[in-house]
Amino acid sequence: MQKKEKIRKMFAGISRRYDFLNCLLSLGQDRKWRRFAVSKLPEGLVLDICSGTGDVAIEASGKNDVVASDFCYEMLELCSSKISKKGILNASCIRNDAENLSFRDGTFDGAVVAFGIRNVADIRKALSEMHRVVKKGGKVVVLEFSRPTNPFFRAGYYFYFRKILPVIGRIVSKKDGAYSYLPSSVMAFPQRDGFSKLMEGSGFSDIKYHDLTFGIVTVYTGSK
């Protein structure tokens, strides 16, 4: 099975427990991380890629018109339901593949992807698509897990991340693979300078990154 289809099925299987597990496993820090990422977006029309259940899109809708996109129908269904229940009128949902976006060149003032870029089959292609659909002078924001830099904190965090988190995730979601996949995917993901170089290679400039919560996550920004 190709990685793309495997990932889609995995997220479809955990979609109903996804929000609860995000909050539980991050000890509530995920909300703070999303707020910080959204604060880096420009005002205007924003594309939320790999939107999942729509938390970033909902956060961004406070100051932006938002299009939430995801390739997993089950996730997008929850996203649409949450937006509707909150009475948000300036956000919409559309099924879309991060590696092959259906939007015209230069459609958006900004784009954001939170905890999704590491899951795409071709990271360079997804970044190039983000670059394509953002206007000249527009900005992109990427929020992703990182490996902590402090050696003392890192040791304890790795134990939690590799041993405890998958067990909790498996019990709550009743799915074996999803939360075992998370640690392995984070360990394989290019870190800080490495990912910044991928962004640069996709055409972005003025690339910066900000570590949050002892480097558990990193927010990357870049301009077109």
Regions found by a protein language model. Name each.
Residues 138-145:
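Conserved beta-strand signature within the Rossmann-like core of class I S-adenosyl-L-methionine
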Residues 5, 147-198, 208:
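C-terminal alpha-helical "lid/dimerization" subdomain adjacent to the S-adenosyl-L-methionine
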Residues 26-44:
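Conserved alpha-helix/loop element of class I SAM-dependent methyltransferases that forms part
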Residues 124-136:
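A short glycine-rich, Lys/Arg-flanked "PGG" loop and its adjoining helix->strand segment in the class I
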Residues 45-100:
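Class I SAM-dependent methyltransferase SAM/SAH-binding core
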Residues 18, 111-112:
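Hydrophobic beta-strand segment of the Class I
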Residues 99-110:
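A short acidic, Gly/Pro-enriched loop at the edge of an enzyme's catalytic core
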